């Protein structure tokens, strides 16, 4: 397994295919994955397992029974960023370099409802958006996660991942 400074947090994910695809992305970029219950599926859902391919034994995945449990069981020195279309910060404006020594947690809401208003208010200064063309309402959850992970890898000179594939 690996140790990572970046954490992807899915708040009550609803679509198994998205979660499976996010497992693959987290594995590819060596990111930790946190799932906050309740889910809209079972973890053994065949659609999720298929979308995760052969990454299930490689991903660092943590389950949390609630938001409160997540806060209690993760390190106190963490930066929590919420992904939302109304965010004022873009991923490139966040210092994601691993020498920052701070654990980064990027929280993604439900596919149909987003994040609860209470969280949006609590973290109003830590909201991130992926810039997209205005007529488009949103992009797929797993694509949004991939955008954040790519920026993380870019800021860290891709961790020599490209050289490992040559």
Curated annotation (Swiss-Prot):
Coiled coil stretches, renumbered: none
Q: EC number(s) of the enzyme?
A: 2.1.1.207
Q: Does the keyword Methyltransferase apply?
A: yes
Q: Name one GO cellular component term.
A: cytoplasm
Q: What is its main location?
A: cytoplasm
Pfam families, per database record: SpoU_methylase
| Matches recorded under InterPro entries | Alpha/beta_knot_MTases, SpoU_MeTrfase, TrmL, tRNA_m1G_MTases_N
Question: EC top class, in one word?
Answer: transferase
Q: Listed GO molecular functions? A: RNA binding; tRNA (5-carboxymethylaminomethyluridine(34)-2'-O)-methyltransferase activity; tRNA (cytidine(34)-2'-O)-methyltransferase activity
UniProt: S-adenosyl-L-methionine binding residues = 83, 109, 130, 138
Q: Where in the cell is it found?
A: Cytoplasm
Catalysed reactions, as listed in the record: cytidine(34) in tRNA + S-adenosyl-L-methionine = 2'-O-methylcytidine(34) in tRNA + S-adenosyl-L-homocysteine + H(+); 5-carboxymethylaminomethyluridine(34) in tRNA(Leu) + S-adenosyl-L-methionine = 5-carboxymethylaminomethyl-2'-O-methyluridine(34) in tRNA(Leu) + S-adenosyl-L-homocysteine + H(+)
Q: Keywords assigned by UniProt? A: Cytoplasm, Methyltransferase, S-adenosyl-L-methionine, Transferase, tRNA processing
Any one of the GO BP annotations: wobble position ribose methylation
Q: What does this protein do?
A: Could methylate the ribose at the nucleotide 34 wobble position in tRNA.
Question: Which PANTHER family does UniProt cross-reference here?
Answer: TRNA (CYTIDINE(34)-2'-O)-METHYLTRANSFERASE (PTHR42971:SF1)
Q: What family does the database annotate?
A: Belongs to the class IV-like SAM-binding methyltransferase superfamily. RNA methyltransferase TrmH family. TrmL subfamily.
Q: Please state what the protein is called.
A: Putative tRNA (cytidine(34)-2'-O)-methyltransferase
Originating species: Mycoplasma pneumoniae (strain ATCC 29342 / M129 / Subtype 1) (Mycoplasmoides pneumoniae)
